[in-house]
């Protein structure tokens, strides 16, 4: 990494990194191979060892030096002897090497940024559960939210022209762009092998959109935003700041039109493609931002994005579906007794409270899709391998149950998870009974329901049962919301399909 960093410092021109010469360096493909990018190329029934893999890379680099293969049309490349043999293999090597190369400057910027802000253990700040305390502190005072699904890009701009020609070359040679953007089961092997490059291109599109959006938000808000990019350890992408004011208005009309969307209190959060824009403004104000974003995508990114894909919802009467939770702002009534001299009276106060619930119906649909139950929520048995032991089966079901309890530990009403635990518990019992060719009742009678419940006990239940006698302060642990710092991705069963 030090050698790459020295090269980039020497070859940097106008703050843009020209990565084209790195394609001809052998150590780049070695790094890509060591990081697991090329594992699928060498290890799937090809019989290549490390020595022969290095020889293939050397031969590829030698042939790239001999001829200019990056400006060839698709028809000419079909007649080129360079691609006549091992065409797919060479294309995969270049594509995966390219995926590693384009991440180098952004990784270096991320490391230097973390060192500059003296953030040592930033991995503890990656938890997606850290979003919900932010929502609790801010969303209870807001009125409307925009539910936004960020569209896929039609094209992605790369400032390095030489690398852009290379990217265009192997994309034309290896697959079509539509299958890359919307990979299917029967798509080309590019989308299956090199998902890292696809994610890099899409994230670069999203980060360019967000960099411009944050700039516009800062211009229209009295509050200065705090970047969460370092806290989430995202790769930084720097757009062209000098063209931000020309997104869809001219420089002359920029400040004149910006007052239409000015708001002193706005908040923006995103996870993957789902983003939320919340404000204290009115419905008319949110409609202005909706039109603003649609025009922004159409003019700056050449994307057709229908306005009906952005939903305007009021927090007081709508539940926000985000990160596997149903979040809403509800009124929490409280009665206060006040007494002045001989007169006593009651005061009714309604306090806004941010509430997080478990979406039971979508979660049951996810369990039904995973064959734990039917569409009505009735538990069913799962076919298992005959060589699995009973303890292994119980441990697998228990792990699923504990992971769900761990992820939904921030729910305001944890009793709603009892139905999910019941489905998993009975599905496990039916699976074991099917294996032993017995009935569920007979199997539970022989095994003992206490043993099965011990495996399916959630983390909070274990904590309460272990320390309940030692401390009375833990008695409310089952009713309190707990946010963990070790959850960096959404649970697979909780990642059900939303209305988008």
Curated annotation (Swiss-Prot):
<keyword id="KW-0934">Plastid</keyword>
<dbReference type="GO" id="GO:0009507">
    <property type="term" value="C:chloroplast"/>
</dbReference>
<dbReference type="InterPro" id="IPR024937">
    <property type="entry name" value="Domain_X"/>
</dbReference>
<dbReference type="GO" id="GO:0008380">
    <property type="term" value="P:RNA splicing"/>
</dbReference>
<dbReference type="GO" id="GO:0003723">
    <property type="term" value="F:RNA binding"/>
</dbReference>
<keyword id="KW-0819">tRNA processing</keyword>
<dbReference type="Pfam" id="PF01348">
    <property type="entry name" value="Intron_maturas2"/>
</dbReference>
<dbReference type="Pfam" id="PF01824">
    <property type="entry name" value="MatK_N"/>
</dbReference>
<dbReference type="GO" id="GO:0008033">
    <property type="term" value="P:tRNA processing"/>
</dbReference>
<keyword id="KW-0694">RNA-binding</keyword>
<comment type="similarity">
    <text>Belongs to the intron maturase 2 family. MatK subfamily.</text>
</comment>
<keyword id="KW-0150">Chloroplast</keyword>
<protein>
    <recommendedName>
        <fullName>Maturase K</fullName>
    </recommendedName>
</protein>
<dbReference type="InterPro" id="IPR024942">
    <property type="entry name" value="Maturase_MatK_N"/>
</dbReference>
<dbReference type="GO" id="GO:0006397">
    <property type="term" value="P:mRNA processing"/>
</dbReference>
<keyword id="KW-0507">mRNA processing</keyword>
<dbReference type="InterPro" id="IPR002866">
    <property type="entry name" value="Maturase_MatK"/>
</dbReference>
<comment type="function">
    <text>Usually encoded in the trnK tRNA gene intron. Probably assists in splicing its own and other chloroplast group II introns.</text>
</comment>
